[in-house]
From Swiss-Prot:
UniProt induction comment: The onset of expression occurs at 48-hour-old stationary cultures and the steady-state levels correlates with the onset of aflatrem biosynthesis at 108 hours.
Keyword Cytoplasm part of the UniProt annotation: no
Broad class of enzyme this protein falls into: isomerase
Family membership noted in the UniProt record: Belongs to the membrane-bound ascI terpene cyclase family.
Main localization, broad class: membrane
Membrane topology, from the record: Multi-pass membrane protein
Name of the molecule in the record: Terpene cyclase atmA
Cited function: Aflatrem synthesis protein A; part of the ATM2 gene cluster that mediates the biosynthesis of aflatrem, a tremorgenic mycotoxin with acute neurotoxic effects. Synthesis of geranylgeranyl diphosphate (GGPP) by AtmG (a GGPP synthase) precedes condensation of GGPP with indole 3-glycerol phosphate, followed by epoxidation and cyclization by AtmM (a FAD-dependent monooxygenase) and AtmC (a prenyltransferase) to produce paspaline. AtmB is also essential for paspaline production, but its exact role has not been identified yet.
This protein's record includes keyword Transmembrane: yes
GO MF annotation: an example: isomerase activity
Transmembrane domains' residue ranges: 9-29, 84-104, 113-133, 162-182, 195-215, 233-253, 291-311, 333-353
Amino acid sequence: MDSVLRYVFLLLAMTSFYMMYISLFNNGFFNLLSHQLATRALPGESDIALLSEYTGLKAFDGILESIVIFFWPISQGHHVGLSLTGLSFSGGMVGIWMIVVVHICRIRSFTRGMVITLIVGIAQQAVGPGIVIPCYFALTSRARPPNKNLHLTGTYSTSNHGLVVSMIMSYIFPLVIMSLPAPAMISPHSKQQVIAAWQGWPVYFVIIMTTHHLFINRGHRKEASARRQVLSVYHFGFACSCLCHMAWLSAFVASKIQSLSQSSNFWYLCPYGVAFPLLNQPAQRLGALEAGLFTFLQWDYCVAAAATMVWSTDRYIQECHRAELEIDKFRLILRLLGWILIDGPSATAVRLIWESEGPSYLQNPN
């Protein structure tokens, strides 16, 4: 079964790579990105100049310029569907990242766990979680911690507060600032700098985790049971993923109400491609560059979420078998479909993981 899963994860990674890079390259998306970079202006903002210096390193600044152009339409809010897709992506990644970090801390010592966390985080920022997350699960598909040892080597040392605080400070807080509209609430100059600085969030995450481990948490490592700490981390990831998915789902329903009733109350939603990922193309009012970003984000998030769901479902089934519990596959499929619709794919993966952790749940799955 592990070998089959490994091939599934690798297939997902290759699919993501093809759709995010090869297909978009053939469709001219990266040429559009290069052309926009050559204009030295931000997308949709002909009067706002693109910053040319962020770190003082010319090669690195060139990469950051492309990244700022990439993230500007998503964070600025001109295109509602694109921004909502970015919101769903960002919130969903919190749940996925919590699952990955907890798994890393569970099977490694704190130092090695932080090194691996840093490598995985930088890799996913460089090429996208849609490629890196399936590859990570493919490489670690055999590394399952024993059910009897529920505490995490890394998380036990840093507590749930270390993981949650690190995620809030390194990822969520800069993301909120980055999403403020310019120039209404933040200057375009500052917004570009925040977008560039946010790209290093995996580094900030590891630094905050290490600081918490070394200086803050030494005096109260046993303040909560290990299992409760793990569940707190999962609940945090679930809440972030679910809330962002519900925001997107509400906008989707509103846009469909508008299209059916021809009401003018939701006119601002319908033209911007608020659609189920992968099924619909962005609407006609999206520019070519924004349409490419829409497609890139959809494949990046959906493949990462699908890989995490496959891994979580396999983990859940393995734990049920270990507890000698029978699984009603038809009922499980129906529950998964309902959770995916209401909670979102990332939150569904987190829900499966936390339910597989509790012996009390395994003894009474109803």
